[in-house]
């Protein structure tokens, strides 16, 4: 049994034993309801889902057989409800919960294919149902989590099936299907033991190649990282050693951080289509979790993974430093957190699995090494300005301190002392305190544990840590400051977490030796003094608000910002020994009696409450009794009304003095005392019984008072008193019951997953009410509920008050008393008894146990109250309907009466929010290496677990009877309840908004619990929308209730409500006010978003108009509203159209539905295309896209079986006829084009592709009505759009798709009808008109219908040629999109070739007439680039390959074209052509085919284009450089002819180079560079050398290409080539080239540090060192900066070697200088180089102080007297050193000797800095 259930109050715990049987009963019920032959039976099973979830959340003990039976049934139901998304969402989610909870006990076999089919059918198909997008989103989430849960149950062989299924999607990396493919692989691929044999070396190589095919795309990265992380974790048999350098290189480059002053994010990340990002987990950030998990599971004894991790940390640690924060901080913070969590989980797994192999387990050396590395990150991030990072660091410290205390604890201690000493950065103290709080337990355990299994190392003294705790506690006293909330809370957290560890707090015990500075009682005194001072200085957050809403606890930051204050008091007072507790109690009691602090009611109340909770008898005597007496004596002196219910009415009237007012001070004092009392007695229980008389008197006097504020305080007291008497709550919660076996001074903490030896965990003790307490509670009920009810009736029936004001006051007080009692007894007052339907006396069902206290009163009392309140409500609505306080009170009473258990539910959900208890301070991880006790789960202090058990009980009590009547139709709601529902229905249409909202909330809760009442409510509310003269507030109230989920759900199954709802909304256009219109539209939009299809019985009722039912005419009624001609407002016309569409779409699923309606509707929407209303036109487009299907007119492909002729005729003739009649009308298409062109808005900013462009005139609501979810799941284009020269278009694929479907539906007649309007619009002047023409033409060309060839020859081809040769420029983007659409491949992977593609390509490729202008040339190239992107390279037919070859030749000849625009186009097309060819070649190598061996392929293999370009490039670079040199020399005036000639040549070369740079840039931008890396590596030199030339445009392009190059990681195969280029350019004669080589080197080394060989690194180091003594000063300084970066980068042996050499060199120069005093023979460059070597070493450790640093800095400072470039270098370097070490200088300066500090001070200008 789960610990929380074991610890429930005894009466409840007894009941839980019946839960196993009741779960078995539920499973039987579900089984009976589900009939596999009837798919509609799903709806009947839905009501049981919340009951099944109850058992899971109640942590009940269930039998595994029942669970596995339920899971099997659930999966059947899930698969059988194909089109019922809502049912799939509900069942999917509950299955996920069950499978996850019982995953280790179930033995299932789940097939993956049906799950995949569900996913494809609902989310990736082109013809989805009508469901709203919110539902679709939930459905996607549900299905994907179900797949994730079922992965572990996939049978053997599933992995290879899944891989081969999705491999085909991954063939072409430049098609969006590859993104989908990677998402599916990540989602489905199982790594369970049955499938592990699938993961072989070959598979890994394959994955790494695929991963490399799309660079710079975080979506892609995260999919593959996640797949690999799972394989690495679960398949421990794979040897990863050889892949480590490559993988770590990937990991490093996935963190987008700024390297060497570069930017911190990819310049062009590959664009992932919106729907793919939306559907698959779209973490666009770095996949930190998967990276961390992979790294942790790489670690093994003897593996090189640890060195690699160290290198990774060395490179990343600088970005954790507070001064280097940025966008990347989040992903780095996650990385640190997941590293530590994964490490902890792995240790736990190895601890619990005794047979794991020692060869793969982490031993002591591996643990020490790992902790050492992670501490570097912790050290950097500890004082980060980023809140999350500093908290993560503290949590990580805490977890690691249990693994390696000898490393972590000294670090915590030194950091704490550092924070104490700092004077400038005070925020550090808060963080340091948090660290000590989080590591408190491990510090105490390692110091006090008797089992000294861990030796903390010789020089570390145990006392040191105990002192640390002592110091932190004494400092904590200073930290309590009313003006510094964060620090105060951190202090309280610290005290609470340290004392949670102690068994008892007492002076006499020696164990608390850490209280070095004083005895514990002195500390306690000081603490209470500070606390009292803090309370006296608190400022309340807001003015304490009057009226009902002021709770007793609207507190200051101590209460509002977290539970630390209260927890600390409870723990402290609970752990004190007897004598110390009395000492504290005296002090607190004195404080409470002498102070009145209205600003700190809650805080003082909680202080008293904690005292009472700890030892009730004494605390009640010392705190509660004096306060009670004081408040009663004050109450006697104040004026009374006498409505408090003591004594009879006559005596009171005579008693009443003339109205005298109460002084505000006295009122505030009484209010304060009563409220503090009410909080203090919360846990009083039976110790309050002796003061029974006083309490009754205090409450009655408070209600009798004439002050409303005092009445309210009395209400608090009564509530609290009732709760204290009859509720179950834990007592002794904070006492220590079991001591730690290894360290008796500490408390032993408990894990909820108890292993056998912990069985004797002490139970928690509960307050179970005694007979006297229940009796007292019943007396209070008589006094304040029964008598108040009688008063209420008498006020309402016999007018006893002549004065309206008196009557109001009397009503207020009476209602307040009733409310107060009901809120106090919660669900202890029995619920209404429902009336059985068929005179049968039936036992109520039992689901789960739960009660919040013992029973008081009886169900009769509840019924009597309900009937009285019904009468009172009637009276109030007649007489006092404008008095909101009375109405709100009465609604609260109704809520408490009707919604049994909801008060507990509210309390539970509020408390759940307040749980910051999960903080690391009170969690001890399962694997504890300090005491060597390992448990199955995390351990926590007993009080925290009792708290959870208490909340668990509260939740159970709110749920125990909630679902009893929802599942059982045999009970009808009791009569008093129907009264309440009627009253609430009236109140939720009230004209005060507050009243409406409250009543609405309460009503919705009631309807949810009693679904039988729904239809009555829906009918009466929709009636309000239809009535002509209804007030605005009635409409608002009705809409609020109708838009609730319960109602929307109810509409899917109840025909009557459904038709009434729709007609109600559609016939509500007569409401004038803006607010009501807005409410109605919002309701309609919400209905659309959550629309869940219709159940069979509604569809039946729609058709059954034959039998004369009313809703049958629904379709025709709505149809008549949806025509333009009807005089409706345009938005209602739109809504009617939408409803019509929803009905038709829902009914398509039903096979018996008549096709006639479908045809009529399709015709109706086709006509609507030329409607006058723009919104209706947009909806018509959506509708036609859904209703028109591919049809018989499509040409038969080779692989499709031909359909026999007569079938073709019948199949679709009706729709064909219906549509043909419409579009054959004269001028139909012309008008349609006209009206569609108005929707195209040419504004540049909002016309992003695929977005209907109409964003500028569509509000959000209109969008929700006119669009469908699927419009972006079938989005076009299906390939990434990255070509900027195409411009932004306003081409809407959904328009093109209508024309395509029309052509497929009706064949050639459509083409003929389109001919003349197309000819007219293609030549139109306006861009929108040309755009419509482009869409229509694209659709027709892509339709593949019979007869298309003839039309192409007769007129379409001419039309296209005219477009190409046309002079107009502005519509190029649209026509390019048209061509792109027309040649787009068909099918999911875009590999099926459309029939017209070849013709269209030939038409574009055809050479232009010689007279063509550059505009036309540019246009042709734009069209070409658009068309070529769409080809699918792996499977190109030979014709397309030939086309590629022809084009390549043409383009290479044209690379020096005179127009810049055309050069760019040529560069872009070249990158597409070359990468297409390369991809095809690599595909042919892997999957060679027989017909593949044609002459074309051998032509491709020669790669002539590559040779040509490479040869030309090196020649061009030389020419350009020479030309620029001769330009600079050539100042003479007489230019000879040869020179001019060469100038022209060099200009051609410049143009040629520009084209080449465009080629490089577009290869990177498009992500196609992966296939062209060898080509690009060859062009590295031109890019580096042409950054500074006299040709501005060329240099700009070179710089752009250079920026992109910096991000590229080259694979090992091309590295040698790149390094060769780098080394040779570092020797270049031009110093600018040397400098740009250095710039490239910095990022190059960072990106490739894992994959470079030792020799290569050596060469590079040598080269850079040589540049330290370069003749050009800029190069020297640059080289020093690069070296500093290289030294940070983790190659310690190189760095150390260089440091020693440079130090020796500089030292010898310095000595020679000192000897000669005269200027030496050595050149300036030599000395400068030596100094720069020192500078590089000093700057390579910006924040640390390694042992060699002081000498280096001092030596550097000695050079300050040198001449100019050297002097400034030294000064800058020393200043930089000083800046970066300023934070920790206080400690670091101890590393220097006096002399060294003096030399430093001489160099520094402001010596005060260095004390």
UniProtKB/Swiss-Prot annotation:
Expression induction: Upon MG132 treatment.
Keyword Lyase: no
Protein name: Proteasome activator subunit 4
Domain notes: The bromodomain-like (BRDL) region specifically recognizes and binds acetylated histones.
Repeat (HEAT) residue spans along the chain: 563-599, 1156-1193, 1442-1479, 1613-1650, 1655-1692, 1746-1783
Record region (Bromodomain-like (BRDL)): 1626-1711
Subunit and partners: Interacts with the 26S proteasomes.
Gene Ontology biological process terms in this record: DNA repair
Record-linked InterPro entries: ARM-like (IPR011989), ARM-type_fold (IPR016024), Blm10_mid (IPR032430), PSME4 (IPR035309), PSME4_C (IPR021843)
Keyword annotations from UniProtKB, A to Z: DNA damage, DNA repair, Proteasome, Repeat
Disruption phenotype: No visible phenotype.
Source superkingdom: Eukaryota
Gene Ontology terms for molecular function: lysine-acetylated histone binding; peptidase activator activity; proteasome binding
The keyword Aminoacyl-tRNA synthetase belongs to this UniProt entry's keyword annotation: no
Organism of origin: Arabidopsis thaliana
């Amino acid at each position: 049994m789960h610990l929380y259930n074991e610890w429930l109050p005894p009466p409840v715990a007894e009941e839980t034993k019946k839960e196993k049987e009741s779960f078995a009963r539920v499973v039987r019920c579900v089984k009976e309801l589900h009939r596999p032959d009837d798919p509609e039976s799903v709806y009947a099973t839905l009501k049981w889902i919340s009951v099944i979830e109850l058992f899971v959340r109640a942590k009940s003990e269930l039998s595994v057989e029942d669970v596995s039976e339920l899971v099997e049934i659930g999966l059947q139901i899930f698969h059988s409800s194909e089109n019922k998304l809502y049912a799939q969402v509900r069942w999917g989610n509950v299955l996920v919960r069950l499978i996850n909870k019982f995953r280790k006990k179930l033995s299932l076999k789940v097939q993956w294919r049906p799950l995949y089919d569900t996913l494809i059918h609902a989310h990736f198909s082109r013809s989805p149902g009508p469901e709203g997008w919110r539902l679709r989103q939930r459905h996607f989430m549900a299905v994907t989590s179900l797949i994730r849960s079922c992965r572990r149950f996939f049978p053997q062989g599933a992995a290879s099936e899944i891989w081969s299924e999705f491999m085909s999607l991954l063939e072409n990396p430049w098609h969006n299907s590859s993104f989908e493919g990677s998402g599916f692989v990540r989602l489905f691929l199982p790594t369970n033991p049955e499938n592990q044999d699938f993961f072989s070396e070959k598979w890994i190589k394959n994955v790494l190649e695929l991963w490399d095919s799309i660079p710079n795309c975080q979506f892609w990265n995260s999919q593959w990282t996640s797949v690999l992380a799972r394989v690495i974790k679960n398949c421990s048999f794979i040897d990863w050693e050889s892949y480590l350098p490559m993988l770590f290189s990937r990991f490093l480059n996935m963190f987008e951080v700024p390297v060497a002053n570069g930017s911190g994010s990819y310049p062009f990340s590959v664009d992932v289509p919106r729907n793919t990002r939306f559907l698959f987990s779209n973490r666009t950030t770095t996949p930190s979790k998967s990276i961390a998990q992979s790294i942790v599971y790489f670690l093994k004894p003897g593996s090189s993974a640890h060195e690699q991790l160290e290198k990774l940390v060395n490179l990343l640690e600088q970005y954790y430093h507070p001064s280097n924060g940025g966008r990347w901080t989040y992903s780095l913070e996650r990385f640190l957190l997941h590293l530590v969590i994964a490490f902890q989980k792995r240790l736990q797994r190895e601890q619990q699995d005794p047979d794991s192999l020692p060869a793969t387990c982490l031993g002591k050396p591996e643990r020490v090494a790992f902790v050492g590395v992670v501490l570097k990150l912790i050290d950097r991030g500890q004082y980060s300005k980023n809140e999350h990072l500093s908290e993560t660091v503290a949590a990580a410290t805490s977890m690691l301190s249990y693994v390696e205390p000898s490393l972590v604890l000294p670090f915590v201690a030194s950091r704490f002392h550092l924070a104490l000493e700092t004077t400038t950065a005070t925020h550090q103290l808060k963080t340091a305190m948090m660290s000590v709080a989080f590591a408190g337990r491990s510090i105490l355990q390692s110091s006090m544990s008797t089992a000294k299994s861990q030796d903390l190392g010789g020089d570390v003294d145990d006392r040191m840590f105990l002192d640390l705790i002592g110091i932190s506690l004494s400092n904590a006293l200073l930290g309590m400051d009313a003006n510094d909330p964060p620090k105060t809370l951190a202090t309280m957290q610290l005290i609470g977490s340290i004392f949670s560890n102690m068994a008892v707090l007492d002076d006499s015990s020696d164990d608390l030796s850490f209280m070095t500075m004083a005895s514990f009682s002195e500390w306690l005194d000081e603490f209470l003094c500070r606390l009292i001072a803090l309370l006296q200085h608190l400022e309340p957050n807001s003015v304490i608000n009057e009226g009902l809403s002021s709770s007793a606890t609207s507190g200051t930051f101590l209460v509002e910002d977290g539970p630390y204050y209260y927890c600390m008091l409870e723990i402290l007072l609970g752990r004190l020994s007897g004598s110390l507790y009395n000492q504290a109690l005296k002090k607190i009691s004195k404080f409470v009696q002498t102070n009145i602090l209205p600003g700190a009611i809650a805080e003082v109340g909680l202080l008293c409450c904690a005292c009472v909770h700890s030892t009730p008898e004494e605390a009640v005597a010392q705190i509660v009794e004096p306060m009670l007496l004081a408040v009663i004596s004050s109450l006697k002196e104040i004026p009374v009304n006498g409505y408090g219910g003591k004594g009879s009415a006559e005596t009171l009237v005579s008693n009443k003095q003339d109205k005298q007012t109460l002084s505000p001070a006295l009122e505030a004092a009484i209010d304060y005392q009563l409220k503090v009392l009410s909080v203090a007695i919360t846990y009083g229980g039976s110790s309050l019984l002796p003061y029974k008389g006083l309490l009754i008197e205090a409450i009655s006097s408070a209600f009798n008072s004439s002050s409303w504020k005092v009445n309210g305080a009395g209400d608090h007291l009564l509530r609290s008193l009732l709760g204290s008497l009859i509720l179950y709550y834990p007592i002794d919660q904070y006492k220590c019951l079991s001591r730690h076996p290894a360290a008796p001074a500490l408390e032993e903490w408990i894990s909820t997953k108890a292993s056998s030896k912990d069985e004797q965990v002490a139970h928690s003790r509960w307050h179970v009410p005694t007979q006297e307490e229940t009796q007292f509670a019943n007396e209070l009920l008589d006094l304040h509920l029964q008598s108040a009810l009688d008063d209420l009736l008498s006020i309402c029936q016999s007018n006893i008050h002549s004065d309206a004001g008196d009557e109001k006051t009397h009503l207020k007080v009476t209602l307040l008393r009733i409310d107060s009692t009901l809120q106090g007894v919660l669900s202890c007052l029995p619920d209404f008894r429902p009336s059985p339907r068929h005179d049968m006396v039936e036992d109520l069902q039992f689901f789960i146990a739960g009660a919040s206290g013992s029973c008081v009163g009886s169900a009769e009392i509840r019924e009597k109250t309900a009937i009285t309140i019904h009468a009172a409500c009637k009276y109030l609505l007649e007489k006092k309907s404008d008095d909101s306080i009375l109405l709100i009170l009465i609604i609260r009473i109704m809520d408490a009466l009707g919604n049994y258990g909801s008060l507990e539910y509210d309390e539970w959900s509020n408390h759940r929010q307040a749980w910051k208890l999960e903080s690391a301070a009170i969690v001890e991880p399962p694997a504890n290496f300090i005491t060597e006790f390992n448990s199955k789960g995390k351990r926590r202090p007993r009080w925290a677990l009792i708290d959870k058990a208490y909340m668990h009980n509260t939740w159970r009590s709110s749920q125990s009877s909630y679902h009893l009547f929802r599942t059982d139709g045999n009970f009808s709601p009791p009569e008093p309840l129907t009264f309440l529902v009627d009253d609430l229905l009236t109140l939720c249409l009230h004209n005060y908004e507050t009243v409406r909202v409250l009543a609405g909330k309460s009503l919705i809760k009631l309807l949810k619990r009693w679904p039988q009442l729904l239809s009555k409510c829906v009918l009466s509310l929709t009636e309000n929308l239809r009535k002509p003269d209804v007030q605005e507030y009635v409409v608002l109230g009705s809409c609020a209730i109708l838009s609730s989920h319960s109602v929307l759900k109810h509409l899917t199954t109840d025909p009557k409500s459904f038709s009434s709802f729709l007609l109600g909304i559609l016939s509500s256009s007569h409401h004038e006010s803006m607010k009501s219109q807005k409410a109605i539209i919002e309701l309609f939009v919400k209905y659309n978003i959550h629309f869940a299809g219709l159940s069979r019985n509604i569809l039946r009722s729609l058709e059954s108009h034959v039998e004369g039912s009313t809703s049958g005419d629904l379709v025709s009624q709505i149809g008549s509203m949806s025509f333009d001609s009807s005089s409706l407002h345009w938005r209602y016309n739109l809504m009617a159209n939408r409803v019509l569409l929803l009905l038709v779409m829902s009914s398509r699923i039903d096979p018996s539905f008549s096709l006639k309606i479908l045809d009529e509707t399709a015709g109706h929407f086709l006509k609507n295309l030329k409607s006058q209303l723009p919104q209706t036109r947009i909806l018509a487009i959506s509708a036609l896209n859904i209703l028109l299907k591919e049809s018989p007119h499509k040409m038969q492909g080779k692989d499709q079986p031909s359909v026999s002729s007569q079938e073709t005729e019948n199949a679709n003739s009706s729709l064909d006829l219906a549509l043909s009649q419409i579009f054959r009308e004269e001028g139909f298409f012309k008008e349609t084009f006209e009206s569609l062109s108005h929707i195209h808005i040419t504004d540049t900013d909002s016309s992003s592709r695929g977005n209907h462009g109409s964003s500028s005139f569509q509000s959000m609501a209109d969008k929700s009505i006119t669009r469908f979810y699927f419009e972006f799941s079938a989005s076009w284009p299906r390939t990434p759009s990255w070509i900027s020269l195409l411009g932004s278009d306003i081409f809407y694929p959904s328009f093109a798709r209508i024309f395509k479907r029309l052509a497929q539906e009706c064949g050639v007649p459509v083409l003929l009808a389109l001919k003349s309007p197309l000819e007219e619009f293609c030549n139109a002047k306006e861009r929108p008109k040309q755009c419509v023409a482009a869409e229509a033409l694209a659709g027709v060309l892509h339709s593949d219908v019979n007869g298309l060839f003839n039309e192409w020859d007769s007129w379409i081809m001419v039309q296209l040629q005219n477009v190409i040769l046309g002079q107009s420029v502005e519509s190029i983007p649209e026509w390019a999109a048209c061509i792109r659409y027309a040649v787009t491949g068909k099918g999911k992977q875009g590999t099926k070739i459309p029939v017209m593609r070849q013709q269209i390509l030939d038409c574009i490729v055809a050479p232009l007439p010689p007279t063509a202008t550059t505009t036309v040339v540019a246009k042709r190239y734009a069209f070409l680039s658009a068309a070529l992107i769409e080809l699918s390279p792996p499977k190109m037919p030979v014709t397309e390959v030939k086309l590629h070859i022809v084009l390549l030749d043409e383009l290479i000849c044209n690379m020096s074209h005179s127009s810049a625009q055309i050069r760019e186009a040529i560069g872009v097309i070249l990158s597409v052509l070359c990468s297409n060819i390369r991809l095809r070649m690599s595909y042919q190598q892997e999957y060679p085919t027989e017909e593949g061996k044609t002459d074309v392929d051998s032509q491709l293999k020669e790669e002539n284009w590559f040779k040509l370009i490479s040869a030309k490039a090196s020649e061009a670079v030389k020419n350009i450089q020479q030309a620029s040199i001769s330009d600079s020399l050539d100042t003479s005036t007489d230019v000879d002819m040869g020179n001019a000639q060469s100038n022209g040549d060099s200009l051609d070369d410049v143009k040629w180079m520009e084209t080449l740079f465009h080629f490089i840039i577009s290869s990177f931008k498009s992500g196609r560079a992966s296939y062209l890396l060898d080509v690009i590596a060859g062009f590295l030199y031109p890019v580096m050398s042409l950054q500074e030339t006299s040709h501005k445009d060329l240099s700009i392009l070179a710089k752009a290409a250079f920026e992109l190059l910096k991000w590229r990681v080259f694979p090992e195969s091309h590295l040698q080539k790149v390094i060769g280029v780098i080394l040779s350019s570092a020797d270049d004669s031009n110093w600018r080239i040397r400098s740009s080589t250095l710039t490239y080197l910095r990022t190059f080394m960072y990106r490739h540090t894992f994959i470079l060989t030792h020799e290569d690194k050596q060469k590079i180091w040598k080269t850079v060192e040589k540049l330290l003594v370069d003749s050009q000063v800029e190069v020297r300084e640059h080289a020093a900066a690069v070296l500093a970066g290289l030294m940070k980068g983790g190659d310690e042996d190189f760095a150390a070697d260089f440091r020693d050499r440079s130090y020796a060199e500089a030292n010898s120069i310095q000595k020679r200088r000192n000897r000669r005093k005269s200027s030496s023979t050595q050149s300036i460059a030599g000395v400068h180089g030596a100094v720069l070597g020192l500078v590089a070493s000093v700057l390579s450790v910006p924040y640390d102080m390694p042992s060699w640093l002081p000498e280096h800095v001092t030596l550097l400072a000695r050079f300050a007297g040198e001449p100019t470039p050297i002097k400034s270098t030294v000064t800058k370097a020393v200043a930089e050193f000083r800046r970066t070490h300023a934070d920790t200088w206080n400690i670091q300066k101890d590393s220097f000797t006096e002399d060294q500090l003096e030399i430093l001070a001489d160099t520094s200008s402001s010596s005060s800095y260095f004390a």
